[in-house]
């Protein structure tokens, strides 16, 4: 299912997956899935919002996949406004637990979610970014506020390189701590061909 969402800059297709047993009086988590370069919101939806929908066996969340802006680089400055207006629409029309709003994405979608983590800490509880980078077409001013953040990088990714992912991590560690003191509290990375570390 999808809607044609009218916002201040036009119309954007937005895919919404509601729990089958949706109760208008029960607050639900809200999870945004952001498409990658060359991708589509329909692909995010078909792939279960990076697998998160498939593990939501108790139907605790509403999942949303907005289409990008239609260009090769699907998220830009205007899309931060799209996010704000779409979030306001969803909170006004569905029973959302506003303390549990999340965003995730892969590659360019991760870069957009990462950008949101810099200045939307007041509305986002956490982001999960797969193959992210600390850069984008446009990035917001950073707010020195904490947010939950998990990043996964690929050691052989030539576009969103491991170094870009590590830079994104270091920025969040700086924002998440007074005076940036957490910058050196990095999680240990797994060695190549070794088990993941959590």
Q: Each PLM stretch: what is its role?
A:
Residues 1-30, 104-128, 132-134, 167-170, ...:
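A domain-start/cap signature at the N-terminus of enzymes
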Residues 19, 49-57, 117, 140:
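Mature extracellular/periplasmic domains of secretome proteins
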Residues 30, 34-93, 193-197:
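Active-site machinery of serine-nucleophile hydrolases
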Residues 95-107:
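Alpha/beta-hydrolase fold nucleophile elbow
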Residues 151-153:
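Short beta-strand/loop motif that positions the catalytic acidic residue
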Residues 156-161:
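Acidic catalytic loop of the alpha/beta-hydrolase fold
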């Amino acid at each position: 299912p999808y809607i044609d969402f009218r916002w201040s800059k036009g119309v954007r297709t937005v895919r919404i997956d509601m729990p089958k047993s949706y109760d208008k009086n029960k607050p639900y988590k809200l999870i945004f899935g952001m498409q990658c370069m060359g991708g589509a919101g329909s692909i995010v939806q078909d792939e279960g919002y990076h697998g998160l929908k498939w593990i939501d066996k108790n139907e605790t969340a509403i999942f949303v996949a907005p289409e990008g802006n239609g260009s090769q680089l699907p998220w830009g400055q205007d899309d931060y406004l799209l996010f704000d207006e779409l979030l306001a629409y969803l909170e006004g029309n569905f029973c959302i637990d506003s303390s549990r709003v999340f965003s995730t994405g892969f590659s360019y979608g991760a870069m957009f979610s990462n950008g949101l983590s810099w200045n939307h800490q007041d509305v986002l509880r956490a982001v999960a970014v797969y193959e992210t980078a600390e850069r984008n077409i446009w990035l917001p001013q950073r707010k020195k506020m904490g947010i939950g953040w998990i990043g996964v990088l690929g050691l052989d990714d030539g576009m969103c390189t491991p170094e870009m992912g590590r830079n994104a991590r270091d920025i969040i560690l700086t924002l998440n701590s007074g005076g940036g003191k957490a910058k050196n509290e990095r999680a240990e990375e797994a060695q190549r061909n070794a088990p993941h570390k959590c």
